[in-house]
Amino acid sequence: MVYSKTFRVEEKSITVSARGTIGVVFYRDFAYLPAVSLICFVPKEEFDIRFLFHALRAIKFKKQGSATGQLTVAQFKEYGIHVPSLKKQKEIAAILDPLYSFFTDLNEGLPAEIELRKKQLDYYQNFLFNWIQKQKELVEQASTN
């Protein structure tokens, strides 16, 4: 694992917020310009980047410093990560990736799904009550004839 000092990061990498809300971990598979409030990690070959992403997400970072909070590279190194073999890293990432995707999709998709179900409920509720009202009117018409 290396600390990125380049202005533009082209490789797949992991960023961790180091100021304000510290410890927010992002996987980046696109080129970006890192802000000074990020610690950027471009893994060496012995690391599976998705394993590193999940391992970093599992750390409970402690706020240190001013009221804003900060995390320095030196402080970050104190947390340490147990790194299994590359094969085991890939196995762990293969298990955690689908779970992470499921929960991420759930958090993003659930509000939209709830809204669609509300619209569906409104539609069928209106349809059924209108149908009941029409049936009632037909019965009343038939009884008056």
UniProtKB/Swiss-Prot annotation:
<keyword id="KW-0238">DNA-binding</keyword>
<dbReference type="Pfam" id="PF01420">
    <property type="entry name" value="Methylase_S"/>
</dbReference>
<comment type="subunit">
    <text>The methyltransferase is composed of M and S polypeptides.</text>
</comment>
<comment type="function">
    <text>The C-terminal section of a specificity (S) subunit of a type I methyltransferase (MTase); this subunit dictates DNA sequence specificity. The single R subunit has multiple frameshifts and is probably not expressed.</text>
</comment>
<comment type="similarity">
    <text>Belongs to the type-I restriction system S methylase family.</text>
</comment>
<dbReference type="GO" id="GO:0009307">
    <property type="term" value="P:DNA restriction-modification system"/>
</dbReference>
<protein>
    <recommendedName>
        <fullName>Putative type I specificity subunit S.MpnORF289P C-terminus</fullName>
    </recommendedName>
</protein>
<dbReference type="InterPro" id="IPR044946">
    <property type="entry name" value="Restrct_endonuc_typeI_TRD_sf"/>
</dbReference>
<keyword id="KW-0680">Restriction system</keyword>
<dbReference type="InterPro" id="IPR000055">
    <property type="entry name" value="Restrct_endonuc_typeI_TRD"/>
</dbReference>
<dbReference type="GO" id="GO:0003677">
    <property type="term" value="F:DNA binding"/>
</dbReference>
